């Protein structure tokens, strides 16, 4: 392969955590079991995304001199995708894995992904065969992935989240992306290189509650739409064109009715319907444009992506923010 793999690679893991005090003890046990099975060194970076429970205290108690664990703690909650993005900026290793703390994605699958990476793939992402969430969330996720794949200007694999391993050069390229609202799975696809999927059974949460509610999923979907497609803007233009044709047709109908047949078009009721229809179309178009303008506004402010309040373990205390 063009990209030569090191003989003794190291694996770095990025694990975003937000109010995961219930799941963390199980996660730490699973990570220890994976470390015993692995024939490569593993370093784990836990990113505390401004948790309000005992997440940070549990992590701090698990870190000791010589530990392969480290942690960075945000000054507030910046969001799951930003937590992964920050982890990519601080993690070390020849190959980098991303996994959530809830153990829905089995850590032992990471070792199979690393084997695929050894074969020459630069990105190995997990493909979920099934999900154990409730019907509403399963339907929402399914719709999100299919809609994103259908309108994005790049190929984003179906049913693949952030669970993956990436070659170091892929991570370095993602770190250069300036987006303040990054969608990691989208950026991972955008960089290209050799990518492949690995199917696995997605489990139920080991403990605690899911942090991705339906409103958060909708926000993630909007983020994906405006980040990787201009189709909504094109649809708005076509909608405007269609409504203009409808308006022109109504005008012709009114003229023909009055001049040719001596019939006066219906009064205030039809006028109210027409006004409401066109007003609704205008508001929809303004909303779409506003969503894109809002993203541009966030980018031009150029605020830091995140702020690190403190760090523990092997992670360097430098680079406390990313602008």
State where each predicted segment sits.
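Acceptor/aglycone-binding surface of glycosyltransferases and processive sugar-polymer synthases
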Residues: 70-76, 80-90, 104-187, 203-222
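Hydrophobic helical membrane-anchoring modules
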Residues: 2-10, 183-323
């Amino acid at each position: 392969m063009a990209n030569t793999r090191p003989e003794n690679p190291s694996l770095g893991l990025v694990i975003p955590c937000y109010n995961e005090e219930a799941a963390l003890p199980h996660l730490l046990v699973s990570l220890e079991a994976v470390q015993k099975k692995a024939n490569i060194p593993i370093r784990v970076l836990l990113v505390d995304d401004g948790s309000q429970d005992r997440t940070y205290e549990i992590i701090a108690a698990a870190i000791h001199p010589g530990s392969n664990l480290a942690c960075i703690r945000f000054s507030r909650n910046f969001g799951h995708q930003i937590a992964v993005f920050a982890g990519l900026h601080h993690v070390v290793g020849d190959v980098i894995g991303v996994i959530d703390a809830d153990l829905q994605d089995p850590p032992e699958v990471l070792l199979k992904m690393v084997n695929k990476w050894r074969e020459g793939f630069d990105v190995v992402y997990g493909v979920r065969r099934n999900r154990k969430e409730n019907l509403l969330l399963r339907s929402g996720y399914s719709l999100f992935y299919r809609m994103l794949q259908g309108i994005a200007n790049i190929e984003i694999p179906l049913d693949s989240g952030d669970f993956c391993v990436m070659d170091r050069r892929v991570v370095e390229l993602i770190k250069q992306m300036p987006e303040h609202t990054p969608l990691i799975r989208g950026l991972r696809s955008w960089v290209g290189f050799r990518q492949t999927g690995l199917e696995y059974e997605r489990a139920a949460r080991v403990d605690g509650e899911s942090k991705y509610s339906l409103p958060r999923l909708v926000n993630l979907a909007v983020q994906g739409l405006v980040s990787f497609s201009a189709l909504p803007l094109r649809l708005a233009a076509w909608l405007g064109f269609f409504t203009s044709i409808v308006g022109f047709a109504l005008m012709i109908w009114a003229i023909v009715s009055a001049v040719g047949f001596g019939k006066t078009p219906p009064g205030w009721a039809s006028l109210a319907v027409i006004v409401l229809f066109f007003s609704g179309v205008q508001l929809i178009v303004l909303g779409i444009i506003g969503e894109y303008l809002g993203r541009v506004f966030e980018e031009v402010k150029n605020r830091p992506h995140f702020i690190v309040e403190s760090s523990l373990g092997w992670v360097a205390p430098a680079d406390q923010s990313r602008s």
